[in-house]
Amino acid sequence: MLPNSNGNFTGKVAFVTGAANGIGRATALAFAREGANVVVADISEQGNQETARTIEELGRRAIAVKCDVRRAEDVKAALDKTIEIFGRLDFAFNNAGVEQKIATTADLTEEEWDRIVNINLRGVFLCLKHEIPLMQKLGGGAIVNTSSGAGVKGFKGQAAYVAAKHGVVGLTKAAALDYAAQNIRINAVCPGIIDTPMMDRFSGGTPEGRQQVISQEPIGRMGQPEEIANAVVWLCSEAAAFVVGHAMVIDGGQTVQ
């Protein structure tokens, strides 16, 4: 829970993609601890249901919807369900994403390029496209998109991932300007090396692989999903009411080296 938390989100509704584990699950739980009811969306039904059950154990309502963010019909159906059950959408965390297989640009397959860009960038666009009209009807809201440290600098062997995450930052800034005057604040978070299942896959899940990844962090450790969740919840709160179109880097100093 955030410091000095007092349930400021009571009666409000949050929509979180990529909620089956990692940053998405931590953020869904953080919204619930702040008083919100939460719609959790993910392609993984088992993990998504586990997140929903944990939210209900916190005393908040939750619904789990299967959603492939590459598919406009899935995104629309998930948000239609949100309105059907809760009647409103106050916050959205567009977080679903996947890691890229390491490959230099010329060796990157078209299929891998399409997979990364369609999930990590197109998915965010589709969520925004269907979330924003619901917030317009409500008179406002707050949206946070997940970019990455790879959204603010380049990384060798990660052309598709870097391009997609830079795209999320650009999309966030453009959309923020489109809707700021309508009381819809849109921002992004740019996590560094966070201890999640995705990072385990990227590092190979071995102690040696993890240590190699940690060696890139000036702070000397991986970040925790809750550290990103706290930032997302803050960006959605009234404390951040003047923060618009910002890409918040949360990376232990990795990108300032």
Model-derived regions, located:
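Short, small/polar-rich loop/turn modules that mediate ligand/substrate recognition or access, typified
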Residues: 180, 185, 243-245
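C-terminal helical subdomain
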Residues: 71, 188-191, 208-243, 252
